[in-house]
Amino acid sequence: MQYTRNTTMTKTDRDTLRSLHGRKKWEHIWAYYKLPLAIVLIIVYILGYAAYRHVTKKEDVLYLGLVNITAGSDLTEQLTTGFAEAQGLTKKQQVDLLSGLLLSESEHAEEQYVYASEMKLLGAVSAQRLDVVLMDEYARDRLLADDYFLDLRTLDASFHALSGLNAGGTVLDISDTPFVRQAGFSGRVYLGVVQNAPHPERAAAYIHYLFQR
């Protein structure tokens, strides 16, 4: 009985559709098929969006963090795109920049912002989304006390000869490197590579890049 009833309904609908013309015919088609059409459109959108994300997704080849320092547009370009070009990277590869991190309270950063920065920094390290840190003297001392950085000499034996390296080999003064010197920072700028850096070889290449003439 159920099968006969469904067949009759389908035939009735077809007969109705044949009797309609013009706009009413299209309105009937839309009323009858709008749900399946909507489902198909949603599926097409999801598949298209997934394909778009796959094609345009960037690969992060180095994670760079700025702590207690701010880079202008020119320096930011040199620290990110400039390095990517020097390395001959593809357009789908990039340096991921984590900026705006402040570990000391000032007129521009209240206690809550400093706390949020600390959590953001800790989260990036825990998730292995941080390689190189550029920082001021205060941030250097804070992060050194928390044993954030590895010995840079383990990345490249030639780093033993760097004059700006601290006694432990964990922090490098990069204030006199070409890009940083041109930026005109009021204080010294330091570099460290975190202990669990996901791209240590790229971090070593980054240090060489900063010292290039």
Predicted segments — roles?
Residues M1-E27:
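N-terminal Lys/Arg-rich, disordered targeting/topogenic segments
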Residues K34-R53:
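Hydrophobic membrane-insertion alpha-helices, especially the h-region
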Residues D60-T70, V95-S99:
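Short, well-ordered beta-strand elements
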Residues I69-S73, Y138-R142, A197-P198:
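Solvent-exposed loop/turn segments at secondary-structure junctions
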Residues L79-E137:
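Extracytoplasmic/periplasmic/luminal assembly and interaction segments
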Residues Y113-G168:
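Extracytoplasmic "Venus flytrap"/periplasmic binding protein-like
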Residues S186-H199:
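A bilobed periplasmic-binding-protein/Venus flytrap-type ligand-binding module shared by bacterial periplasmic
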Residues P198-Y209:
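Short amphipathic alpha-helical coupling segments at ligand-binding clamshell hinges
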